[in-house]
């Protein structure tokens, strides 16, 4: 199975076709692990006992044609809880319990992959049929390998207790209460950021509307100025024509130098 998974990963590592491109929301922004941990429904620390292949279904599908020969793309995992569930979780199961996780494999925008006999931190959610699925908050990773860095991060964010022998996480959480008291909740900060971004978008829309109206007003002012210039030019032409006409009329009213004078009345003698 591991060989099949590696082969599938190599196949998917090639350049994707245009129809296979991952489409994320235009307003998408990456979130940190700590922020996504606050938004995840459930966090468990468990070891993978076995892997089982799965056929394409509601939670296992690809945007391109799936062929029967592409085995190993989708699978489920049987895991064993290494610690009691983190506080604040809706999933209440003790250490040593075994769970089945579905919805694992290689997808268009992300991959939820695990290896048998290895331990991981899982972000999980439960669907309406009580199936446990990876909770890919913000379209990002939902499975984290068992490393010292991840142990330190998750033990400072969540309270694990009653872990199996050799799996104690409490050694990293000496300052957990201090961090929890002084840390702003990421969800509220994220909400405030979203609201601020929405406000900025609305302001940008208003600015764009005002700029459009300003351009329209400028065009109207240009047209009015052009009409005014044409009216002034036409007025000057009319004034010049009127002046010439007046001069012609004035010239027609004066007697000509060769014209006969007015006829005098006859002289009467007494």
UniProtKB/Swiss-Prot annotation:
<dbReference type="GO" id="GO:0045600">
    <property type="term" value="P:positive regulation of fat cell differentiation"/>
</dbReference>
<dbReference type="GO" id="GO:0008610">
    <property type="term" value="P:lipid biosynthetic process"/>
</dbReference>
<feature type="signal peptide">
    <location>
        <begin position="1"/>
        <end position="21"/>
    </location>
</feature>
<dbReference type="GO" id="GO:0051055">
    <property type="term" value="P:negative regulation of lipid biosynthetic process"/>
</dbReference>
<feature type="coiled-coil region">
    <location>
        <begin position="188"/>
        <end position="251"/>
    </location>
</feature>
<comment type="function">
    <text>Negatively regulates TNF-alpha-induced pro-inflammatory response in endothelial cells (ECs) via inhibition of TNF-alpha-induced NF-kappaB activation in ECs. Positively regulates lipid accumulation in adipose cells.</text>
</comment>
<keyword id="KW-0175">Coiled coil</keyword>
<dbReference type="GO" id="GO:0005576">
    <property type="term" value="C:extracellular region"/>
</dbReference>
<dbReference type="InterPro" id="IPR040311">
    <property type="entry name" value="CCDC3"/>
</dbReference>
<dbReference type="GO" id="GO:0010629">
    <property type="term" value="P:negative regulation of gene expression"/>
</dbReference>
<dbReference type="GO" id="GO:0007165">
    <property type="term" value="P:signal transduction"/>
</dbReference>
<protein>
    <recommendedName>
        <fullName>Coiled-coil domain-containing protein 3</fullName>
    </recommendedName>
</protein>
<feature type="glycosylation site" description="N-linked (GlcNAc...) asparagine">
    <location>
        <position position="100"/>
    </location>
</feature>
<dbReference type="GO" id="GO:0046889">
    <property type="term" value="P:positive regulation of lipid biosynthetic process"/>
</dbReference>
<dbReference type="GO" id="GO:0010804">
    <property type="term" value="P:negative regulation of tumor necrosis factor-mediated signaling pathway"/>
</dbReference>
<keyword id="KW-0732">Signal</keyword>
<comment type="subunit">
    <text>Homodimer.</text>
</comment>
<dbReference type="GO" id="GO:0005783">
    <property type="term" value="C:endoplasmic reticulum"/>
</dbReference>
<keyword id="KW-0964">Secreted</keyword>
<keyword id="KW-0325">Glycoprotein</keyword>
<dbReference type="GO" id="GO:0045833">
    <property type="term" value="P:negative regulation of lipid metabolic process"/>
</dbReference>
